[in-house]
């Protein structure tokens, strides 16, 4: 199964995040929400586990239907890809 990948901190989850995810869901695409495992600070008051729990509750029906997956991802410093990798790069 293929997924549209979204990487973020999601601190806190808000309507802008929902709109972003909904764009792909409306196209019939599955979505994988990756929570960056960032260190707690003023901008990141919630642990990745707390964010995952919050998203799992808010998106319970979509997760249960298999349309959305939520995972914790190690913190990243860049996204790198080669030519012809078999997926689209989409900016919203």
Place the predicted regions along the sequence by residue.
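Nucleotidyltransferase catalytic core that binds NTPs
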Residues: 1-92
């Amino acid at each position: 199964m293929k997924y549209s990948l979204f990487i973020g901190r999601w601190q806190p989850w808000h309507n802008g995040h929902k709109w972003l995810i909904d764009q792909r869901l409306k196209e019939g695409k599955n979505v994988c929400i990756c929570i960056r495992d960032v260190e707690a600070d003023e901008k990141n008051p919630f642990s990745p586990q707390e964010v995952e729990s919050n998203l799992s509750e808010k998106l319970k029906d979509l997760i249960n239907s298999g349309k959305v997956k939520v995972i914790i991802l190690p913190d990243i410093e860049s996204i790198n890809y080669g030519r012809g990798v078999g997926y689209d790069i989409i900016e919203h």
